């Protein structure tokens, strides 16, 4: 009798455990050769966690529960997507000097993330090849893309059979290549199809009927958003209109907002796409006089208070970079690793250029350009600004490149500085007079008309 009682209690205990599945999520990792002092994790547009790397290159956190979804892990200036589900226990290793190429996941839930990383790298390797195929006919191009799509599908089938993914993970991992190749086809049509008739458009775009235009689960997934941006761009083009010319016009971006309003169903997706279009329009500084008109329409479409605040702030920051205004003050770090105000720098007309410690090839080409400009414009001071804080490695780079450390600085808070100075591209250059007033807040160092 007692044995039966104990057996019953044990079975009840087991059943009780089964009714309470593990929902905890562990996320940790190590950053080799860090390019900044922290790692941030985002869910949607919200910061979930920030890990400081001051005393260690490792970080970790156990969460009692997290909603399944696509999270973003950022180590400035790079980021990657991570697919997390209940009971995942993931460790990620990163070498910041080769961020995407070095990404390796291990632990429970690693396989789906390694698959996403592998797909991304394979697609990047295919970019040059596919660009070379833009001269082929629509039929030939579709055949090429279909062949690559079939190859990725076979890889996915093998990965799924070995790991028994959840339906949610299956959807995300399949979307990584399905929407990527759909986006490539949209771009081909965008660049080559401006003379197609309606029948040619319909034949080429047959893949669209298999796709979803309101998938909120993918609202923060790059392949999906990239596809939709190409889709709405193509839909916004007028018959015979050239994309490379049209994209410079505010009216074109207004038409893209109309496509979002009429064709995109998911609220989160709509808001993300409208935000992306708003960024492209506002950062097209040649359209500055038309931005108020654009924003009026954007305000009607957007339903996200945080995005509204963000876009308005960007517009205001851009206004503060108008010619004749004083350059907004930020805190910089000099080559002695001491902090100072940017207001202390203006002794003579100055050209500010930017570089990243993780993109040394870009830095080398930048320095070649700067040395040429220095020889031609001795009345200007040319100041380099690393978008990451300076460190001993950066100081060694200055010596190797034979740069005057007195003209080299680093940002100590990229988030604040990039907003105040509207730093969105490494080729961005700011030209200042000796009073610290802006002459050109949005010059491009590599453009042919830079010296004008």
How would you label these PLM feature ranges?
Residues 1-26, 441, 451-452:
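Bacterial Sec-dependent N-terminal signal peptides
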Residues 17-169:
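A non-transmembrane, solvent-exposed segment enriched in polar/low-complexity residues
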Residues 45-47, 326, 424-426:
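Short, small/polar residue-rich loop motifs at catalytic or cofactor-binding pockets
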Residues 96-340:
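Oxidative protein folding and maturation machinery
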Residues 339-370:
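Short active-site neighborhood of thiol/selenol oxidoreductases, capturing the structured segment around
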Residues 361-401, 413-417:
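Structural microenvironment flanking redox-active thiols in thiol-disulfide oxidoreductases
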Residues 397-434:
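Short, internal strand/loop/helix patches
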Residues 425-428, 434-452:
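Non-catalytic, surface beta->alpha helical segment in thiol-disulfide oxidoreductase systems
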């Amino acid at each position: 009798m007692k044995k039966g009682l104990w057996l019953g209690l044990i079975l009840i205990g087991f059943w009780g455990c089964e009714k309470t599945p593990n929902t905890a999520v562990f996320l940790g990792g190590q950053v080799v050769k860090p390019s900044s002092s922290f790692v941030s994790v985002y869910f949607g547009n919200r910061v979930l966690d920030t890990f400081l790397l001051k005393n260690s290159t490792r970080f970790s956190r156990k969460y009692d529960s997290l909603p399944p979804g696509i999270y973003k892990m950022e180590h400035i200036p790079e980021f990657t997507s991570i697919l997390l589900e209940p009971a995942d226990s993931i460790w990620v290793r990163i070498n910041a000097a080769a961020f995407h190429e070095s990404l390796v996941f291990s632990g429970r839930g690693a396989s789906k993330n390694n698959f996403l990383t592998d797909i991304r790298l394979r697609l990047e390797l295919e970019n040059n090849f596919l660009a070379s195929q833009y001269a082929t006919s629509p039929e030939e191009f579709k055949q090429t893309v279909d062949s690559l799509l079939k190859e990725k599908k076979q890889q996915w089938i093998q990965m799924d059979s070995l790991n028994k993914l959840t339906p949610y993970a299956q959807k995300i991992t399949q979307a990584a290549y399905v929407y990527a190749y759909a986006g490539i086809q949209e771009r081909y049509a965008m660049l080559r199809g401006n003379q197609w008739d309606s029948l040619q458009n319909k034949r080429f775009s047959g893949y669209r009927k298999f796709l979803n235009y309101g998938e909120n689960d993918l609202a923060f997934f790059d392949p999906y958003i990239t596809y939709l941006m190409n889709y709405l761009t193509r839909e916004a083009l007028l018959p015979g209109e050239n994309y490379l010319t049209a994209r410079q016009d505010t009216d074109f971006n207004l038409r893209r907002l109309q496509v979002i309003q009429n064709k995109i169903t998911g609220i989160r997706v709509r808001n993300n796409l409208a935000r992306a279009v708003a960024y492209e329009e506002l950062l097209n500084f040649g359209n500055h006089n038309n931005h108020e008109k654009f924003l009026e329409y954007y305000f009607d479409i957007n339903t996200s208070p945080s995005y509204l605040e963000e876009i308005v702030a960007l517009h205001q920051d851009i206004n503060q970079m108008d010619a004749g205004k004083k350059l907004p003050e930020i805190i910089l770090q000099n080559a002695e690793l001491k902090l100072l105000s940017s207001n202390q720098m203006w002794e003579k007309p100055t050209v500010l250029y930017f570089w990243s410690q993780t993109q040394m090839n870009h830095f080398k080409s930048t320095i070649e350009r700067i040395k040429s400009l220095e020889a031609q414009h001795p009345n200007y001071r040319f100041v380099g600004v690393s978008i990451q804080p300076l460190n001993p490695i950066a100081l060694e780079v200055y010596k190797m490149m034979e740069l005057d450390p007195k003209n080299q600085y680093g940002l100590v808070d990229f988030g604040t500085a990039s907003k105040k100075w509207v730093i969105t591209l490494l080729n961005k250059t700011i030209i200042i007079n000796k009073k610290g007033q802006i002459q050109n807040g949005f010059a491009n160092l590599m453009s042919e008309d830079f010296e004008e």
